Amino acid sequence: MKKSLLFLAVLCSFSQVFAQNYGYWKKLSATQLPQESLIRTTSYSENQALFTLDLNEFRLALTNVPAVFSGNAGATVYFPNSNGELEKFYVWENSNFEPALQAQYPGIRSFSGNSATDLTATIRFSIDPRGIQTMVMRPDNGTEFIEPYTKDNSVYVLFDTKTRNTPKLPFTCGTIEEVLTHDLLDDTALTNRASNLSYKTMRLALSCVAEYTTFFGGTVAGALGGMNATMTRVNGILERDLALHLNIIANNAAVIFTNANTDPYSNGATGSGGAWNAELQNTLTSVIGEANYDIGHLFGASGGGGNAGCIGCVCVDGNKGSAFTSPSNNIPQGDTFDVDYVVHEMGHQLGGNHSFSHQTEGSGVNVEPGSGSTIMGYAGLTSYDVQNNSDAYFTFANIKQIQTNLNTKTCPVSTPITDNAVPVITFPLPSANTSSPATSFTIPKSTPYILKGVVTDPDGDAMTYTWESIDSAGTTASGANSVASPTKASGPNFRSFPPSTSPNRYMPAYASVLNGVLSTQWESVNSTGRNSKFAFTARDNHAGGNQQTNTTSITVTTSATVGPFAVTSQSTLGEAWAQGSTKTITWDVNNANTLAGSANVNIKLSIDGGQTFPYTLAANTPNDGNEDIVVPSTPASLNCRLMIEPTANIYYAINSKAFYIGYEVVTNCVTYNFTGAAFNLTNGTNSWTTKTINVPTAGTISDVNITVNATHTNLQNLQMAVIRPGGTILTFYNQHCTGSANMNATFDSQGPALACASPLVGTFAPSNANLNTLSGFSQQGNWQFGFKDVVNGPDSGTINSFSIEVCSQTTQLLAADTFGFENFSLYPNPNNGTFTVAFTAQSSDKIAIEVHDLSGRKILSNSYANQGVFAETLQLENAQSGVYLVSITNGTNKIVKRIVKQ
């Protein structure tokens, strides 16, 4: 039988530590694996890597791992990460089994821990006789997983959610939504909600169909290994977000079935359609007994569905054991099964409703646009998908629901937390000039803003944070209206993002604002008035367990009449500032100065493209729309931006284009003529007569002007167009000037409007095209021109000549201090390779001149005797067109200038 092989080329880039003391991991390189041996044949992520694991050596590393909550330091274990490194973790054993079950199956274990180098990264991993699975929740960089890659667990794949390639899978959550009687998102219940220093455990009866057991080898131990792997990830999320842990009950083996002909469950299609709800409840009631578990769940192996049976029904006899989860791809393991499906259905059982808003359910927690992206959303399953998979966390609306529900239950065992304190939110002060925290702000419409949190943790834990919308959508904000929009009057207008190490969130994403985009499909400022509410959640990621959260809220009111607040100066490419010069900054106030905290503004400067703003150009200056500033003595930069923000409010504005400091802009305009003979046009044709002009010199277009000399008795018959190198057609003359004969005209978008005359002579702006749209692209290459006479008749036309003027801009450092080089000059610049350097030397030493290209390669090196007055002409005979650095040295004096060779 011929086997189909999947070729996998994997680069070896890991640290030498792999070959040293912790060599139980081995990265695979240039490996061929039969496709039929793989759990799945599609790639997991762009950054995926394959490994083998010496399981025996790995088990030795786990020999003396302390128990979680023991108070002992964690054991050291190493795992590969998506950065190509072997990462050190401190880990504790954190069993998912009740003690009797754990004693019966000592080879099936679960662990939790924290990274030694990335203090906010937490790990969960499981091990059983077949192998391991891991989950590292890493803020700002996605979640990382290690899972079996081959069916025999001999090869593992490391992948991350940031570059995940997971395809959409069909899945339906059939849970019927119901609204719990507990408060939902009212402000009183929301304020400063924490995990209440209580660690809860619940007893989980986890049954499975026989096909699930078959997938894991056909034995009870194999099925328990699969359950343990899934619950390791599930409990990792529940503990971090809810301080809750589910333990599989001691006699769970009694509801693990190995024979599909005799198990009490329907087949996958029927069961996932809803039959399993009652079948599971009946099984748990009769086999386990209602007094012996708190929450029941069934794992299927096919069918593609989930149904919790009820919302918040844990601890309720006759209902608490009616939930199931089953995959659509026949693979009941892995991140999609564990995070997207199992935690979702268990979240329903614990009291959480759906958080998406593509449909509304009256639950009061439809707080995510579209499909949503958190656990209780429907990522990848709707027509309005934020993304294809769920992120591994609960949105706060669901955290609050579940906490509220569990506080009404008596079955969870609550243990007071004594080794970890709740993080303290000192909600942000609007500025250092005020003494009271603000929980509401009014901002201008169509203006971005920043939500800021201030948190202290008594234990010094590595904190992570989320800012999330808590505006639940109604029917008018569902379906196509569930996406973000500037005119959205209610419901969520900002998607949720996973926990971050920054307590601040830019609304919308800062990268979008830098690009001038204030509205995207999943984030948008409002152009109309409305109130928006947001929850700020702090997670403490406490090492060794007992994690705690705390939350508070803020209201942002968008004014219907004030704004937008926007910077209007520094809005064109190529603006250059000299250090020490005076510049004017302007902005549209639009009555923003009437808002609280907005009478004055701060104006800040960035020289790294807007990543940081370390320079304050004006502090606490009136918010009047105009300010003259002195440019500070910053390092030279080609990527400067401005931020203007009120002194005591949360909105801000960024200027629209990068500008320069310490550089000058050199504009070089060259006219290129068509060198061919005049040519006649064919009457009444839809076909272009095309000609080409080559521009040999590299450069970025800043302006284009086109001149045409044509003979025709009626210019209205003519069409003319241009295509830049690599571009699309742009028609700059389109049947204008009825009855006008002949032209010698230049088309310049900065020119006056077209004024028809006979002949048509002068400079005009094209009436139906904007040549400015060519700016910013490369000028080098073939420019195509098209001409046609679209009217059939006796009058024919001739293009006598045409040309294109292309202007490009280059930058060069402003002239440095020319001390020691009196009367210095370098000319011409730009030049054709020949230029003159002249100055009066202040030193008697020899004069040296070197020319380098921008890669550092030396092009020319000459030495000259010093005669006092120096004037030499230099030639760059074989140098290509481009920018070069000319260095002139006279003793201890040196100057460097840029030249442009055309």
List each model region and its residues.
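Fold-level signature of zinc-dependent metallopeptidase catalytic domains
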Residues: 22-29, 34-37, 155-309
